[in-house]
Amino acid sequence: MRGIAFVLALLIGLGAEAAEGPFRVKVLSYNIHHGRGTDGKVDLERIAKVIQGVNPDLVSLQEVDSGVKRSGEINEPQKLGELCSLTPIFGANIKYDGGDYGNAILSRWPVARQANHKLQSYYPNEQRGLLEVEVTLPDGRGPLLFFATHIDYRGNSPERLPSAVTVNELIATKNGVPAIVAGDLNERPDGAAVVELAKVWTRTNGGELPTFPVDKPTRQIDHILVHPPARWTVIETRVLDEAVASDHRAILAVLELLPH
């Protein structure tokens, strides 16, 4: 009996030690263009295959419809959650064509809390949002914050920089809880909004990994950033080689969350 007890104690100790080590997190950001591909077809199963192909833990989705006529009145977050076996969270920002339009998150882990924050909006009927979830990591590792967003596309837009400031102000209230923000920022790495975010967050790739236009990408406007920098190691960031399912390419970051 003492031998069994010793082995159990050893296994428990090893488990506790493992839980204190780095923890891998795979994040995907994907502007899905409401599921409409370059062939003009709305095909959520095709979008789901792109997502499933990299087996992410957290997914930030932009340009997502729910109950909208143009996409067959489908609840796209729910459908993608079912297809990918992930928990869907939807942040509706605009009433459109009989339904709602906004950002969504898919999560492998339980969602403890969610909030949809409004960002600055200078254009009628084009409210922008920042969707936030707090997920509970396994093995007692604590909470992780994940944000999905889509910032205005217009050149010299008056919205983008204030939106970035709002994101930074929000994370300043979170007391250093590890966080990731991912989305279509509609700016290259040297754009004012991305530079503003980088005062607080760390981009998961240096230089530029082009994500748009989808057929022959020439610029990176989709980004993944982490906070605080000391809690994260970037293992890999890459753009997925898929050019039909949407008008953007998806970007994947493989990260390690370090012990506090």
Spans of features found by a protein language model:
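Surface-exposed cleft-lining segments at the edges of enzyme active sites
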Residues: H34-R36, N116-S121, T149-S157
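Active site of divalent-metal-dependent phosphoester/diester hydrolases
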Residues: G40, V68-E73, L86-I105, P124-Q127, ...
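Short, solvent-exposed loop/turn segments at secondary-structure junctions
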Residues: G35, K95, V111, I151-Y153, ...
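Active-site beta-strand/loop signature of hydrolases that rely on acidic residues for catalysis
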Residues: R24-I32, I47-E73, L106, V133, ...
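N-terminal, active-site-proximal structural segment of metallo-dependent hydrolase catalytic domains
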Residues: R2-G3, L11-L83, F90, K95-N103, ...
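Beta-strand-turn-beta hairpins that frame and shape the catalytic cleft
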Residues: A19-V27, G99-Y101, S107-R113, N125-A148, ...
